[in-house]
């Protein structure tokens, strides 16, 4: 089985072709970072228009790179949500229309399910069940995963997602967009423990997250301490340490609560090396394993959508003729691949 995957949920156009026997055949990605840099963040209308320009050419490139034709495809998977509604509609319209024209099934994929399954693209892939930590610009979720489509959300952010907090704090520090990776780079120059930020919601029971207060704490610290380069680095490190410690504490709590020994970490923030290092130490201390996608599949990409779509199609899950985007779409509402439609 061979699937074309289309990802257009935010500011990256990702196209990929995945074969269940041969693996990933091609992977094309166009990032809109330069387009949005002058605005300090993603402008939804500009994002949608750029997806319109880039999606079809990237599909053509992916077919050529995979050395295959449209006749060799068994289905088209596209991100239907959650995300920016205009951006989602571009991918949904193109994916559903091409599937109709080529007489093959269309599969609507949940963006976060794509991230959750991204480590399955690697040789060292996790076995079910596992605990998943999904950390991105728009979401922070702790999920107990029994199988594909069998998700219990144990905790989530009640305000800013981890990646959003990184970006907002980076902006306070005067760093260019995208701020998260730049803040992590700046933190490498920081002096440990010069500033101590709170670890929000770690003294209370439960697995929910809250990161907006850290942004406020950072803003107050910047206003009080000034903006000389070393102080900026020290604040960046203190902020990053607070986020990572908070996430690690919640992961440890969730692993003990569920009894699971495998942890999957995915989403854009999962590329953070300090986060990876701390969670590796945690899992070693608990006698467990941690799994990540490769860096290029931490951020939005078509490969994860193609893979997730393939699993759905194998289970007989595909779309009718309607075209819809779901900017809000709870992960735990998805059907199990072991369920019949």
UniProtKB/Swiss-Prot annotation:
GO terms for cellular component: cytoplasm. Its cofactor is Fe(2+). It is found in: Cytoplasm. Its main location: cytoplasm. PROSITE patterns: GLYCOPROTEASE. GO terms for biological process: tRNA threonylcarbamoyladenosine modification. Its EC number is 2.3.1.234. Substrate binds at residues 134-138, 167, 180, 272. Keywords: Acyltransferase, Cytoplasm, Iron, Metal-binding, Transferase, tRNA processing. Binds 1 Fe(2+) ion per subunit. This is tRNA N6-adenosine threonylcarbamoyltransferase. The gene is tsaD.
């Amino acid at each position: 089985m061979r699937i074309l995957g289309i990802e257009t949920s935010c500011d990256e156009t990702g196209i990929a072709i995945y074969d269940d026997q041969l693996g990933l055949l091609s992977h094309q990605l166009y990032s809109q970072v330069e387009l949005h840099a002058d605005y300090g963040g993603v402008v939804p209308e500009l994002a949608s228009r750029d997806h319109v320009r880039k999606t079809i050419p990237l599909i053509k490139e992916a077919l050529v790179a995979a050395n295959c034709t449209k006749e060799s495809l068994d289905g088209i998977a596209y991100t239907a949500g959650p995300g920016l509604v205009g951006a989602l509609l571009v991918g949904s319209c193109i994916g559903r229309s091409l599937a109709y024209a080529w007489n093959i099934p269309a599969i609507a994929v949940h963006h976060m399910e794509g991230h959750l399954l991204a480590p399955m693209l690697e040789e060292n892939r996790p076995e079910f069940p596992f605990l998943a930590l999904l950390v991105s610009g728009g979401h922070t979720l702790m999920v107990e995963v029994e199988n594909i489509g069998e998700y219990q959300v144990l905790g989530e952010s009640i305000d800013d997602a981890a990646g959003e907090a990184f970006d907002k704090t980076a902006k306070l520090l005067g760093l260019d967009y995208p701020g998260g990776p730049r803040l992590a780079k700046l933190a490498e120059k920081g002096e440990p423990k010069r500033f101590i930020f709170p670890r929000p919601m770690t003294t209370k029971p439960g697995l929910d997250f809250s990161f907006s207060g850290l942004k406020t704490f950072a803003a107050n610290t910047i206003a009080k301490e000034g903006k000389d380069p070393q102080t900026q680095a020290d604040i960046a490190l203190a902020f990053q340490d607070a986020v990572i410690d908070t996430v690690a504490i919640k992961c440890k709590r969730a692993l003990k609560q569920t009894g699971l020994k495998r942890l999957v970490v995915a989403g854009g923030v999962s590329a953070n090396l300090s986060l990876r290092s701390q969670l590796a130490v945690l899992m070693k201390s608990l006698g467990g394993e941690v799994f990540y996608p490769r860096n290029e599949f931490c951020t939005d990409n078509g490969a994860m959508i193609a893979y997730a779509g393939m699993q759905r199609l194998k289970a007989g899950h595909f779309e009718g003729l309607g075209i819809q985007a779901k900017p809000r779409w709870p992960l735990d509402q998805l059907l199990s691949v072991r369920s019949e439609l």
